[in-house]
Swiss-Prot record:
Family named by the database record: Belongs to the UPF0194 family.
Gene Ontology cellular component annotations, sorted alphabetically: periplasmic space
Family matches, as PANTHER family: EFFLUX SYSTEM COMPONENT YKNX-RELATED, UPF0194 MEMBRANE PROTEIN YBHG
Keywords: Coiled coil, Periplasm, Signal
Protein localization: Periplasm
UniProt keyword S-adenosyl-L-methionine present: no
Record-annotated disulphide pairs: none
Major site of localization recorded for this protein: periplasm
Chain coiled-coil ranges: 107-208
Organism whose genome encodes this protein: Escherichia coli O9:H4 (strain HS)
Signal sequence extent: 1-15
Stated name of the protein: UPF0194 membrane protein YbhG
InterPro entries found in the cross-reference section: CusB_D23, UPF0194_membrane_YbhG, UPF0194_transport
Amino acid sequence: MKKPVVIGLAVVVLAAVVAGGYWWYQSRQDNGLTLYGNVDIRTVNLSFRVGGRVESLAVDEGDAIKAGQVLGELDHKPYEIALMQAKAGVSVAQAQYDLMLAGYRDEEIAQAAAAVKQAQAAYDYAQNFYNRQQGLWKSRTISANDLENARSSRDQAQATLKSAQDKLRQYRSGNREQDIAQAKASLEQAQAQLAQAELNLQDSTLIAPSDGTLLTRAVEPGTVLNEGGTVFTVSLTRPVWVRAYVDERNLDQAQPGRKVLLYTDGRPDKPYHGQIGFVSPTAEFTPKTVETPDLRTDLVYRLRIVVTDADDALRQGMPVTVQFGDEAGHE
């Protein structure tokens, strides 16, 4: 009976050793993953969208800036004048469009009707005169030239009458739809020009897009800039990202949302906390900046890690050690 008992105990011990070894191996696989990266360098060149003479600059190299802060201004005068012109253009176009919609006043219609009566009387007189001249020409009393003059006067009076009748007809029926549409299009064009003038005036003031530190100041007050010319280069300080690389064997551990610990040489015992925000969908050869020798010939995937408790001591370009593990994953 003792021999089976000993064998049973040996099997139990062996199973425990195997299970413990497997657990240790898995924990080492998970907890032991260490990556090396750098704090991402994020800079932006700031410029005016419009051109002009630099009136003032409010910051200098090394200054900390806040989102929404005024950094500089161009001479506003040209853009203020353009805005006034655009507003006047809208007023003129609006008045013309309103006239087209309203049609003609009763007084204008009455004047047009009176003009028709006057033109009708002139035509009747010219027609009668021409008829008389025709009879005289047949009796050889007047020359052919006199008859032609009478015909010309009659034709001119007829044209004047037709013009007056057309004008009265237009006044009574109102403006044509095509004319109204053209006036509306002119108004919309003037409104668009006004919006552009307002935007240009607004863009003659340079506003900080986000928090950061001013690295370089490329111009001074009095400089005449073309649109898009660089004025400042700014280092963006928030959010802080760490760029690291992981090989395919450990890719399953580097999933978006995974929490990690971030160590720097200046704080070896007080890590920062981060969370994986992005994993590149494509592999690439390891950049030269990666410090791990065994990764330099591998294809790796780029990670972006968002630092959740960053401070001013975490500077761009600084090397960082990224530690995976249960402690990081559950904090």
